[in-house]
Amino acid sequence: MADTDDIIDYESDDLTEYEDDEEDGESLETSDIDPKSSYKIVESTSTHIEDAHSNLKHIGNHISALKRRYTRRISLFEIAGIIAESYNLLQRGRLPLVSEFSDETMKQNMLHVIIQEIEEGSCPIVIEKNGELLSVNDFDKDGLKFHLDYIIKIWKLQKRY
């Protein structure tokens, strides 16, 4: 029977704990909430929104920087278009924009003149890439030289250069 008394005592302890919880609940309901504490919650939320906004702005700036860096790379397709347009304009009577312009320049193969213009950075052709108008000088010099060397190798194999 001593065991049953322990069980009854144990159950009665649990009941008193529940009664204490109910009393705490009533005190919370009847207490007045200080309006300043609610303002703190709103302020922290607005701060969180401002932090998120600044974070999004930082990400946007990072993406813009990547686009600018990507824009500076020239593709083989783009350099072929610049060469073709420059060739077309030279055939129509545009004077070559090379540093040492002479009668010898006019006698040279047009492909040599075009490559010389591009290497000197005086090629007048402008292309649009990612919403920006770019000349040959705006592109990465190493990539430009790599593509020009590749195109010249092909022309030499075809005996055009």
From Swiss-Prot:
Cellular component terms (Gene Ontology): DNA-directed RNA polymerase complex; virion component
Induction of its expression: Expressed in the early phase of the viral replicative cycle. Expression seems to continue throughout virus infection.
InterPro entries assigned: DNA-dir_RNA_Pol_19kDa_poxvir
Reactions that this protein is recorded to catalyse: RNA(n) + a ribonucleoside 5'-triphosphate = RNA(n+1) + diphosphate
Compositionally skewed regions (Acidic residues) per UniProt: 1-32
Compartment(s) where it occurs, according to its Swiss-Prot or TrEMBL record: Virion
Record-linked Pfam families: Pox_RNA_Pol_19 (PF05320)
EC annotation from Swiss-Prot or TrEMBL: 2.7.7.6
Protein keywords: DNA-directed RNA polymerase, Early protein, Nucleotidyltransferase, Transcription, Transferase, Virion
Major localization class: virion
GO molecular function, one term: DNA binding
One annotated GO biological process: DNA-templated transcription
Annotated region (Disordered), positions in chain: 1-35
UniProt superkingdom: Viruses
Family membership noted in the UniProt record: Belongs to the poxviridae DNA-directed RNA polymerase 19 kDa subunit family.
Its biological purpose: Part of the DNA-dependent RNA polymerase which catalyzes the transcription of viral DNA into RNA using the four ribonucleoside triphosphates as substrates. Responsible for the transcription of early, intermediate and late genes. DNA-dependent RNA polymerase associates with the early transcription factor (ETF), itself composed of OPG118 and OPG133, thereby allowing the early genes transcription. Late transcription, and probably also intermediate transcription, require newly synthesized RNA polymerase.
Assembly behavior: The DNA-dependent RNA polymerase used for intermediate and late genes expression consists of eight subunits Rpo30/OPG66, Rpo7/OPG90, Rpo22/OPG103, Rpo147/OPG105, Rpo18/OPG119, Rpo19/OPG131, Rpo132/OPG151 and Rpo35/OPG156. The same holoenzyme, with the addition of the transcription-specificity factor OPG109, is used for early gene expression.
Protein name per its UniProtKB record: DNA-directed RNA polymerase 19 kDa subunit
Gene that this sequence comes from: OPG131
